[in-house]
A protein has these predicted regions:
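C-terminal structured domains
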Residues: 1-25, 32, 38, 111, ...
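Coiled-coil-based assembly segments and adjacent low-complexity tails used as scaffolding interfaces
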Residues: 1, 44-48, 62, 74, ...
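Conserved aromatic-histidine-acidic binding/catalytic patches
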Residues: 48, 117, 121, 185, ...
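Extended, well-ordered protein cores
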Residues: 127, 131-281, 378-444
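ATP/pyrophosphate-binding catalytic subdomain of soluble kinases
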Residues: 264-333
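Short, surface-exposed connector motifs at secondary-structure boundaries
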Residues: 64-66, 199-204, 286-287
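Short, hydrophobic/amphipathic alpha-helical patches that form generic packing surfaces
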Residues: 55, 61-62, 128-135, 269-273, ...
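Short acidic, glycine/serine/threonine-rich helix-capping segments at coil-helix boundaries
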Residues: 13-17, 25-36, 41-112
């Protein structure tokens, strides 16, 4: 990705929350009074609130496992700190945060004396400007940074930055940045003020970088005043119940976008292409055996892909069976709309050696038929893991085999840049989510 140079119109400045609007007005007043080329003007595009808890980086820092910045970037330092904590506490070592690890970190943190709960790691939330967001020229970015302490105060910092566009160097289109820090309880108390900071007559986005919680006042306040709630289901700790929550919110008439859905695009595209030839398209109705492999820890991608496939082929979910075992096997049985045929789908969580930043990525898909004469067998697999397991299912020579190239843009903030260009509702996502919801409601 090409780097976008950014000019600081005003570097972060600490102020009281009551001074936010007046301080921002001062920035532009100063610019108007001393106007020389290049001219800086405020963008008139959209506002976005980013809820960035980063609880586990803070817990790891307080417990002395993590020495890096609190920045939301789950890179090598963060993964190594998680591994060290998991080894220290006798947990399964994965280098990823799961529910058991997070629960243990919280327990250990609560046992610390107040003086031990402090840490010196730089908190860069709200300061590490995402190029992907900056390139969309937002009008105002408001970052909410919950802290672990019980302090009742909320601190504020404001700044303004201007991406330098090569096509137009005489004018700078600039964005206001507001960062609010405080405990969860204190941020809850100022939720009304946060909503008022979003520019009234412009589109309003909320990027909720956590599990959606309709029982949380701050979530409800921001959600009610936004045009679009953006989530990333790869963050979800209990995928099944949380996808159900997302479906309930969608049914209420609110627009939700899931960044994890974008990660499925190459898989969907290759699946569709596999059945473009007329003779293969006619054999689609013969598919009655499906295998979907994904990385352990989060089944959101697998469930959404299955929701997409089943909704396109008009399958009706009938039964859901948890078989468990080393791969956490789950089976879903559908009824076809043509001929009342039964379709069996197997979802498996397959451990991989090279885990990436995103939890639960798809690694393999096999579509086939019990009718050996049907030309419908298709195998898709990640180029990083290969097709061996899927081909071992038999009949590989009669299958169309495709490798899915690794996506360089899988990081959430980069996908967000794409989402901010698409302000309309995604009907395909909504229909796929609705089908995934139907499947999950069959869970025993």
């Amino acid at each position: 990705m090409t780097s976008t140079p950014v000019v600081a119109l005003q570097k972060p400045k600490g102020i009281s929350i009551e001074e936010i609007e007046s301080e921002l007005r001062n920035i532009w007043r100063t610019q108007d009074e001393g106007a020389t080329a290049p001219v800086a003007t405020r963008a008139t595009t959209f506002s976005i609130v980013v809820y960035e808890p980063e609880e586990f980086q803070q817990l790891l820092a307080a417990l002395t496992f993590y020495k890096g910045d609190i920045d939301g970037q789950h890179g090598n330092k963060t993964r190594e700190a998680i591994r060290q904590a998991q080894m220290a506490y006798g947990l399964r070592v994965t280098g990823r945060i799961d529910e058991a690890t997070l629960t243990r970190l919280r327990q250990e943190y609560e046992q610390l004396a107040d003086s031990q709960k402090q840490f010196s790691n730089p908190d860069l939330r709200g300061f590490n400007l995402s190029e992907a967001i900056a390139a969309q020229n937002p009008c105002r970015v408001i970052t909410l940074c919950p802290t672990l302490d019980g302090d009742d105060t909320v601190t504020a910092q404001v700044s303004a930055y201007c991406p330098v566009q090569k096509r137009n160097t005489s004018n700078l289109i600039c964005c206001e940045y507001i960062s609010l820090r405080g405990s969860k309880a204190s941020l809850e108390r100022v939720s009304g003020m946060v909503s008022s900071l979003m520019i009234g007559d412009l589109p309003k986005f909320v990027w909720w970088k956590a599990t959606p919680n309709p029982e949380q006042a701050l979530f409800n306040q921001l959600f009610a005043t936004s045009n679009c709630l953006i989530v990333d289901s790869s963050y979800f700790s209990e995928v099944e119940s949380e996808l159900n929550k997302i479906q309930e919110i969608t049914e209420s008439g609110k627009y939700i976008a899931d960044l994890n859905w974008h990660r499925l695009f190459p898989w969907q595209e290759l699946t569709a292409e596999a059945y473009d030839p007329p003779e293969r398209r006619d054999a689609l109705i013969e598919i009655d055996q499906v295998s979907i492999d994904h990385e352990p820890g989060n089944a959101a991608q697998a469930l959404m892909f299955l929701g997409w496939l089943a909704s396109r082929l008009e399958w009706t979910p009938m039964r859901y069976v948890e078989e468990g075992g080393d791969y956490g096997i789950r089976k879903v049985y559908f009824e076809s709309s043509v001929g009342n045929r039964e379709i069996e789908v197997e979802l498996a969580a397959i451990p991989v050696a090279d885990v990436g930043e995103v939890i639960g990525d798809l690694i393999g898909i096999r579509l086939s038929s019990s009718n050996q004469e049907a030309d419908c067998c298709t195998i898709l697999c990640s180029e990083t893991t290969g097709c061996m397991r899927m081909e071992a299912g038999g009949g590989a020579q009669a299958c169309r085999v495709e490798e899915v190239s690794a996506i360089s843009d899988q990081r959430a903030d980069l996908i967000l840049g794409q989402q901010l260009q698409r302000w309309g509702e995604d009907v395909l996502y909504q229909e796929s989510l609705a089908m995934a919801d139907q499947i999950l409601r069959l869970c025993p």
